[in-house]
């Protein structure tokens, strides 16, 4: 509302001076409210009477007709407190505050101007009249520089620009938002959404029934029923029912998942307390191109084929070399020996043999060939066993990667359903008419998935509205709730 009014005294060019009502002494402190428009015209419609005592003064605005009907009262800060139909509402108006301060200065003999006119009175009265007839139990709004909004039995919004919606909901720090019965947003800029949800840390977010972010887990995010970001898990993320992020900068992805170390994304889950963690399949991956990228089954299969071919080539070469070694042992050299054991001839031999008392000496020690061949056979056997072990390991990796591909495909389908639900929720309309509920439905889609959403809303006044919606797609359900403030 515009506060730029031109006010003139009956016979003066001074703007907005306080004027006593005709026939009333200054000690009674009754003041006439001027017209907002018109030169040299002072209104006969409204008057302001100062009431109260012992330092607790208030100003009562009345009609100046025979009925003297009281319209509203305001204090020295320009605040109008309304109590009616289960509502507590505070309206702050700068012109009312200006009038109260001017009246105090005039009482002390100072000539001062003010900004309250008949149009200001009518505007404030219209707000009061409308709010007195609004029937919402447990609704409280503080309208002013540090506006706070609470809606629901025992709901409390005590921080600057805070919002608490739901029975027992609490938003205690600056810019905190708590939506849901018994929810609590106790950190600066924290958000708690859901029944029994707690966001204790600064800049934390908790969404889902009994979702929880510890007070030491700054920037923590817990989404899902009973999801939790535990003590000192700064920047931790728990996504999924009963998921727990217990380490710094770590992500627990999926129902019952729990992180095991800092800087980790963990998708395994605990089927029962105290038992070993089970695994999930991560599917839909492209082939890795960087050292930090995950490898796909396709890439591992190529490595497996290369290893198997290498093993086959190595085995062939070892068999050939072994056969060559055995052929040397089959060669013969005919020799002649005298009775004294001396060699007489050795046909085609490059080595010589001496026989003495049944002992044979072969120069060059070619008698070690058979031993060398046996050693080669043992090495070939060990290599074959190692290759078989590597083949089994590759088969196990292949099975795990196949499982990951299936999981990625399932995640992709779930993401498309979530996108369709988001599109449907975005199509729900916000209420526009003050004091009226609205019901709306919308259809959304993404790729080959569709979702339907329904929602309701209510506009409390021109500045405040709330709405909630729910969307469903192939058995999956998502929801949202929101409160809108206009300043």
Swiss-Prot record:
Residues 27-436 are extracellular. CDD domains: LbR_YadA-like. The keyword Transferase does not apply. It is found in: Cell surface; Cell outer membrane. The keyword Transcription does not apply. Residues 1-26 form the signal peptide. Residues 394-436 are annotated as: Outer membrane translocation of the passenger domain. Residues 27-396 are annotated as: Surface exposed passenger domain. Residues 437-487 are annotated as: Translocator domain. Residues 379-422 form a coiled coil. Residues 295-332 are annotated as: Right-handed coiled-coil (RHcc). Residues 279-294 are annotated as: Neck. GO terms for biological process: protein transport. Induction: In strain ECOR 9 expression is greater at 37 than 27 degrees Celsius and increases upon entry into stationary phase (at protein level). Upon expression from a plasmid in strain AB1157 (with its own leader sequence) more protein is seen at 37 than 27 degrees Celsius (at protein level). Keywords: Cell outer membrane, Coiled coil, Membrane, Protein transport, Signal, Transmembrane, Transmembrane beta strand, Transport. Residues 154-278 are annotated as: Head domain. Residues 333-358 are annotated as: Saddle domain. The chain crosses the membrane at residues 437-447, 450-461, 464-473, 477-487. GO terms for cellular component: cell outer membrane; cell surface. InterPro entries: Adhesin_Head_dom, Pilin-like, Serralysin-like_metalloprot_C, YadA_C. Binds (in a non-immune fashion) to the Fc portion of human IgG and very weakly to IgA; binding occurs on the cell surface. Confers the ability to survive exposure to human serum exposure. Belongs to the autotransporter-2 (AT-2) (TC 1.B.40) family. Eib subfamily. Encoded in a prophage region of strain ECOR 9, upon UV treatment bacteriophage containing this gene can be isolated. Homotrimer; can probably form mixed heterotrimers in vivo. In denaturing gels runs as a band of about 180 kDa. This is Immunoglobulin-binding protein EibE. The gene is eibE.
């Amino acid at each position: 509302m515009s506060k730029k009014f031109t006010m003139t005294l009956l016979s003066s060019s001074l703007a907005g001076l306080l004027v006593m009502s005709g026939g009333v002494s200054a000690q009674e402190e009754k003041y006439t409210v001027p017209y907002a428009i018109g030169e040299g015209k002072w209104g006969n419609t409204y008057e302001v009477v100062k009431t109260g005592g012992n330092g607790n003064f208030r100003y009562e605005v009345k009609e100046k007709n025979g009925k003297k009907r009281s319209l509203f009262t305001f204090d020295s800060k320009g605040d109008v407190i309304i109590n009616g139909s289960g509502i507590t509402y505070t309206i702050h108006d700068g012109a009312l505050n200006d009038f109260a301060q001017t009246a105090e200065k005039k009482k002390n003999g100072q000539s001062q101007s003010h900004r309250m006119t008949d149009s200001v009175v009518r505007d404030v009265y219209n707000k009061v009249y409308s709010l007195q007839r609004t029937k919402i139990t447990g609704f409280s709004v503080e309208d002013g520089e540090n506006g706070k909004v609470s809606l629901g039995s025992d709901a409390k919004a005590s921080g600057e620009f805070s919002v608490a919606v739901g029975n027992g909901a609490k938003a205690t720090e600056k810019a905190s938002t708590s939506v849901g019965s018994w929810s609590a947003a106790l950190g600066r800029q924290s958000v708690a959404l859901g029944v029994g949800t707690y966001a204790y840390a600064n800049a934390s977010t908790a969404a889902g029934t009994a979702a929880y972010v510890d007070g030491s887990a700054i920037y923590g995010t817990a989404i899902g029923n009973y999801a939790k970001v535990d003590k000192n898990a700064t920047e931790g993320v728990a996504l999924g029912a009963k998921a727990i992020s217990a380490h710094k900068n770590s992500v627990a992805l999926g129902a019952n998942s729990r992180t095991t170390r800092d800087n980790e994304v963990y998708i395994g889950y605990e089927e029962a307390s105290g038992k070993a963690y089970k695994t999930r399949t991560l599917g839909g991956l492209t082939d890795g191109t960087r050292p930090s990228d995950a490898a796909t089954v396709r890439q591992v299969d190529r490595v497996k084929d290369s290893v198997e071919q290498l093993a086959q080539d190595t085995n062939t070469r070892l068999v050939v070399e072994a056969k060559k070694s055995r052929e040397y042992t089959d060669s013969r050299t005919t020799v002649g020996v005298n009775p004294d054991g001396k060699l007489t001839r050795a046909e085609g031999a490059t080595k010589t043999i001496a026989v003495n008392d049944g002992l044979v000496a072969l120069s060059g020690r070619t008698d070690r060939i058979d031993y060398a061949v046996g050693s080669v056979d043992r090495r070939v056997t060990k290599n074959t066993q190692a290759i078989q072990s590597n083949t089994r390991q590759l088969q196990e990796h292949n099975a795990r990667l196949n499982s990951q591909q299936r999981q990625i495909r399932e995640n992709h389908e779930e993401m498309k359903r979530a996108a369709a639900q988001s599109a449907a929720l975005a199509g729900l309309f916000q209420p526009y008419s003050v004091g009226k509920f609205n019901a709306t439905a919308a259809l959304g889609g993404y790729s080959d998935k569709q979702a339907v959403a329904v929602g309701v809303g209510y506009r409390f006044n021109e500045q405040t509205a709330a709405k909630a919606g729910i969307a469903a797609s192939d058995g999956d359900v998502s929801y949202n709730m929101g409160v809108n403030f206009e300043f």
